[in-house]
Amino acid sequence: AAVACKAYDAGGRCRTPKARRTVFAQVDKASAAELRRWVRTPERMCFAAVGDTCYGYYVAQAEAVKALGEALPVIYAGVAMGQFFKGSLRPDPALAFFCGLNREAVSAAELDEAQALCYLRRQEVAAGAFAEGVNLVCARGRALGFAKRIGNRVNNMYPNTLRIIKR
């Protein structure tokens, strides 16, 4: 889209392009270092912030994603890494499903079938299987999401919109 304006000396019309909107913001060095810790191949990834959420993109597609994101309305692009809260990353549930997740970056809690169903229903889960802090919740070796243990309590970080409602 462009704006038409009259040229005073030529008597005709000239087109002035609209300024592009910038959707992607650079993440600072400390945040980028924390984000790199969460992926297996950080040299192949670049990171950007959209609003308060950080996203990861493969370097090979980064320019195309940026160009499309500035030209078209984008619903979702890249891997949602999460949001920074008091200097630490609060991981997005999509990061648990990312095939390039570095599983050594965070403690993993393996749950049996009954506990996994409780987790997916956002019900209380026993704190015994979890380490202090953020944990990757797994069942049969597959990542389900994240949970945070604080003392003898576990905060379920599974999205409320995805929870299992019926038994």
Residue ranges, per PLM feature:
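Polybasic, low-complexity RNA-engagement segments
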Residues: A2-R167
